[in-house]
């Protein structure tokens, strides 16, 4: 039975809409939704969860915490043992923030699922989930939106032409990030400052000026990842418009730094590896 109340459609690339509707018609027992930062993975999960009347349980890190704990997963599993009159959908977001022990605790529920119970795991990187988890889930990978879609998101804004160009470059294909930058002047200003640092690193690699940009990122992993994201965007643009043999080694160093940061590596060493 469809939900009688309006359900918001997530902002998706055109190519992702048909797969989402197909999943909504026949929701799998366990689904991983992979969406890089700025894509609407959360919106896709919520759409699937509430399109049909359901009891929805949401699992996320507790306030001021960065991980989903084993105890949270066990509490959720205990709740699933109670009687349900409608289907149950458990949204775990971000799923990659489950500790390894928490993932192992979840595994039994995936191996022996309750009737009419569905798990939606939202993650930026499915490789951070245990292989045993991944093997028991279908996967929906979201893609970046088109330039035309991105431009439409900014049509109703009062941004200057320069701000529009900057946002469309820095957040290309990532609709949630586009909206955040368009609606939050402070955030846009922060991104502009990070972009200036990224430009300095790329134009004067190994210089004192490039090294001087880094200390403000050493104690802020999230900000360091933003810097890396912008560096990747800029290098990809350079490779497309002004190809050079120097680009690939630089791209490899940036990707290595990103991987280290996402696996809780030392921020200082990861960033210095790009510049030095």
Residue ranges and their predicted role:
Residues 1-39, 43-56, 115-116, 124-276:
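Charged, glycine-rich active-site and insertion segments that engage polyanionic ligands
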Residues 19-23, 69-89, 96-97, 101-109:
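Conserved alpha-helical scaffold flanking the Walker A/P-loop in AAA+ ATPase domains
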Residues 32, 89-91, 120:
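Structural motif
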Residues 40, 64-65, 98, 219:
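Glycine-/small-residue-rich active-site loops that bind phosphorylated ligands and cofactors
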Residues 53-71, 129:
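AAA+/P-loop NTPase substrate/partner-engagement loops
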Residues 90, 94, 102, 125-129, ...:
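Helical "lid/switch" subdomain of P-loop NTPase nucleotide-binding domains
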Residues 104-121:
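Conserved catalytic/switch belt of AAA+ P-loop NTPases
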